[in-house]
From Swiss-Prot:
This is Probable translation initiation factor, mitochondrial. It comes from the Eukaryota. It comes from Schizosaccharomyces pombe (strain 972 / ATCC 24843). May be involved in mitochondrial translation initiation. The keyword Mitochondrion applies. One of its GO terms (cellular component) is mitochondrial matrix. Belongs to the IF-3 family. GO terms for biological process: mitochondrial translational initiation; ribosome disassembly. InterPro entries: T_IF-3_C_sf, Translation_initiation_fac_3. Keywords: Initiation factor, Mitochondrion, Protein biosynthesis, Transit peptide.
Length: 233
């Protein structure tokens, strides 16, 4: 009697267990599908660069996909369905064009070729490089020019040309005039003559950022350009 009563329960348990197993296998199969990139041939560097923007790395269950039915029209679909379309087209990838915003509840995606994705990366990298170059190009640099009280006329002219070039290029220039080591001090007349020449040559190109520091041994000028090169362009 006991065996007979237990039999239906055992049968029911076996059926219930089998049903759970089927559901588990179904879930496991879906997880496996979503754990691998639909575009398996893409290089790891491409996947890393576009992480969060291509294939299974797109973290949305529902998306808008462009050109699914009509070119330029957005169609709502699931990520799983979109990835199935990608797998059906060799050498293609699902690319997230735009994130959700106040006008679109879901991200906008598009199916593009590997070639288009590579060009997209090249263009984005190129824009980043140009922006970095522009940032450094527009950054004001400080140039240093050293004079000696006993500098001859030709050397003064050469160094003053460097000062003018630096100012015209939009750089800050620090001019320092001092005695050479183990050289005899020069007269006040010579010092005044050199300082007057420096001030005359830079007139119209630069202005003092702070008052010059002048004493019996040295003189220091910190100049900024009157007109930067970028503002002239």
């Amino acid at each position: 009697m006991n065996s007979y009563l237990q039999f239906p329960h055992r049968k029911l348990f076996i059926q219930f267990s089998y049903s759970l197993t089927s559901v588990f296998r179904k879930c496991q199969s879906r997880t496996f599908m979503n754990s691998q990139f639909a575009s398996a041939k893409l290089s790891n560097s491409i996947k890393k660069y576009f992480d969060g923007r291509i294939d299974e790395s797109i973290k949305y269950q529902e998306i808008f996909i462009r050109g699914l039915e009509n070119k330029g029209k957005l169609s709502k679909t699931s990520l799983v369905e979109a990835l199935a379309r990608v797998r059906a087209k060799p050498e293609t990838v699902l690319y997230k064009v735009a994130d959700p915003n106040e006008n679109n509840k879901y991200p906008i995606c598009s199916i593009i070729s590997y070639t288009e994705l590579s060009k997209l990366r090249e263009n984005q990298s190129s824009r980043l490089r140009e922006a970095e170059k522009s940032k450094h190009k527009n950054k004001t640099r400080t140039r240093y020019v050293l004079f000696s009280w006993r500098t001859d006329v030709n050397d003064i002219e050469r160094k003053l040309k460097s000062v003018k070039d630096f100012l015209q290029d939009g750089n800050i220039v620090e001019i320092h005039v001092q005695n050479k080591k183990r050289s005899q001090p020069v007269s006040q007349e010579v010092r005044d003559s050199i300082l007057s020449k420096i001030q005359l040559e830079i007139e119209g190109l630069g202005k003092d950022m702070k008052p010059p520091i002048v004493n019996s041994h040295s003189a220091t000028f910190l100049l900024q350009p009157l007109v930067s090169k970028s503002s002239e362009l």
